């Protein structure tokens, strides 16, 4: 037996017990004739004491222990003289009588501490060391607890967990697929699933009326803080349901997770916001409603006064930051540079301060008399001490998105985005289609299987861009944690959808014939939702990136620097797969 207890288990009630512990050396220090060693395992840290007056040879061996040595000790639990209130085992220590070195270790490239000195790249390269840190390990423990709660919750509601294939056919709609060559079928490829979408719909046709899966998904897309090339979905589907049924079920799951994971009781239904309102007031389909600063359109007030930037704009909008009139010129210049960054793309920013006497002082005073500036103040309901920030542009949607970035930045600067405050909502009534300039055609805003609102079906022939989707996203603190829709279950309507998306009947049959044929055998009305497990864990753990809630993530370039993947294949493997690599310049 390597241990009788873990390193986080022993308490003052265990004094005088003889115990056996195993773990890693966190640190050691010598004080007079005593050597103190902090022994760490997954469960915590226990202080070990070696006394040269009791056993000089044992103490000498302890002095040679290095960081991350794997050791086993036998000793007696003793009440600690200098207690440590920061750790659960801080009232006790172990007087060691026996030491076994199970494995030595070279000096790690960074300190295995919560406040490590390791940068992101080195931590990713030695991820197995990074995972020894409690700050990272606790995220995976949280993830484990969440998956247990999800399974328990859905099981009680009669959902069945069904695994779907990971090697499937490629579909060009949506993000790019990761593809896998088939050795047995030369020149042909599998794709890794972006989601189990069509497969779970087939399960509904099969009569599995309540399905779920903790599903690994893959998308070959540009990465950012809340994206990884492989990620995990809590994937769910239900038969004989309408939108209200799905929302009720999964809002209930969200409330359950908040209660058991964060001990937060969410009462009342989550607010719902149409997509058009979210874009108009927040410039985003995932608005952070922890704070105000809703957009106000200012075209009627500010256009036509000789300021060419506004006079030539097709959209002028602003936000009001309460109590921020004290911003210095340097701070305002920094905000201007922020919105002018290439990834945001604004050409500049106008500001207006509400002075203590109620007058308005702006950066464009020479174009606007005080009467007009007072109208500006009234449009926001602004008070003395407030700061109004304004953007304009020739594309309303782009300008709103720029204003969204400015709003979030102001929320950060003013401390309005507390990670321990949670604001949940459903965004509903999305457009069914969006126009792609790159493709020169309509694209499905969600996916081709999303049902239109029944009351909008008549518009499919005359004004498809006006058709709303029977779709819904759950947004928490400005993060889309899940989304879904009621699906099309009628083969004629599905064919119409493919036609509007530019599919020929032959192409639709080639790519989705298996689903269309299944519908002919009686498909029930069905719908579902997928939660992003990584995003939920990140949200509850207060992380800025989903990377630290994934055991072995990729970096921002999509590389696994620990495994050095992706990598070139051996020529013999390429030959076996009938592949030739031809890298374009």
UniProtKB/Swiss-Prot annotation:
It catalyses: tRNA(Asp) + L-aspartate + ATP = L-aspartyl-tRNA(Asp) + AMP + diphosphate. Homodimer. L-aspartate binds at residues 173, 219, 446, 487. GO terms for molecular function: aspartate-tRNA ligase activity; ATP binding; nucleic acid binding. Keywords: Aminoacyl-tRNA synthetase, ATP-binding, Cytoplasm, Ligase, Nucleotide-binding, Protein biosynthesis. This is Aspartate--tRNA ligase. It comes from Bacteroides fragilis (strain YCH46). GO terms for cellular component: cytoplasm. Its main location: cytoplasm.
